[in-house]
Every structure is written in structure tokens, then in C-alpha cells.
Amino acid sequence: MLKRIQYILLLATLMLGGAAYAGDLEPTMGEDGIYHYDWYHQSFLELEDDITEALDEGKILMVKFDQVGCLYCEKLALETLAEPAINAYVREHFVVVQLDLYGNRDVTDLDGEILPENEMARKWGVLFTPTIYFIGKSTDATTLPQASNATMPGSFGKPTFFGFLQWVREGNYDGGEPFQKYLVRRMDEIRSEMEAARAASS
């Protein structure tokens, strides 16, 4: 019941948000050739600080690898994250840091090592995009993958992606219900939430 009340409040926010919310549904192509949303975290890429900031806000850090020409990355940006229910849920519960698999911005890992994005990706063993790490609690780990409570390897369909976000948000990665069982049990509810959010934002 509590989750249902929270979702009704979310829909009310969508309806009251109007034009401002509509703008949050459209990513822009950056000079790097990758789609970005304005609400992505403007990070110095010092990941320990990003984790602390997310947790202080009561949110989960989401570190997402993209690359130029990745069709699945574009689908995630243009379709999945533009889905009203998913878009609102991510902005409410997650802090998103976007990295480029072949980029050259300096990233500071949890052990203090500073490497360009492309070298950090190799250090972490990131081979394809999108790859998304979720960090939802404090950690003594020395690398981001070690700190990650859950990892999304690749691009999921909209309902599965939304379900995974909710599964992570509820802390099921920490000995809770396995994701596949969670998804099967809640798929009808997830689809209904998506339909309601579309109606509220139209």
C-alpha cells in the first residue's frame, strides 16, 4: 500500500510538472557524440565523493558506460530513459554519472588511482556498453566494480529495466528476492505503473 501511495504522489508530480517535466524527457547529443540528459550529475569523476553525495541525498549512485555509435546506448537514452515512469524514477532515486568507454577524462577510483576513462574501463574489465554499476551503501572497496551492489550488463527492455531499478532501490541485492523472481511477480504492476505515468504526462 505504501508503494502505491508513493507512486500516486509521483504521478501527481508528473502532472504538476507540465512543460518542465517534458523537457527532462529529451536527451541532447554532446560534442563527444553521445546522448546526455541535463539532469545527469555534473561530476568531477572522483567516485568516492560521488558515492558520498548520492548516499547523503538518500539516493543510489548509478555509473553508466556509453560509447559513440552504440545502438543499445542510444536506445537506452532515447527510448528507455525517456519513458515517463522510468525517467521520473531515476531522477528521484539515483545519481547518474556517465562515462565514455573510449573517453579521456580523468577518473579517480576508490583506491585513489587516477586514469583516463578508457584506461579505467580496462582496469574494471568493462568490455561492452551500456554497462551500469549501482552503489547503494557505504563501502571499503578499493575499486568501483568491487563496491557495486548490482551491475546491469547491457540494455534491457523498458519493463525489465524499470523492474531492475526498483529491485535495486528496494535493496534486494543484499540477500533479498532474486531479480528474476521479483520481475515475474511484479511485471503486471510494473507495466501498469508505466501506463499510468504515460497518461499523466500526456
Report residues per predicted region.
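Bacterial N-terminal signal peptides
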Residues: 8-17
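A short beta-strand-turn-helix
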Residues: 42-61, 90
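Non-catalytic, surface beta->alpha helical segment in thiol-disulfide oxidoreductase systems
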Residues: 122-176
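Bacterial N-terminal signal peptides that target proteins for export
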Residues: 1-8
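Short active-site neighborhood of thiol/selenol oxidoreductases, capturing the structured segment around
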Residues: 56-71, 96
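Detector for the c-type heme attachment site
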Residues: 74-78
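N-terminal "domain-start" segment that seeds a small globular fold
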Residues: 23-51
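Thiol-based oxidoreductase modules, predominantly thioredoxin-like and allied folds used
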Residues: 41-42, 83-115
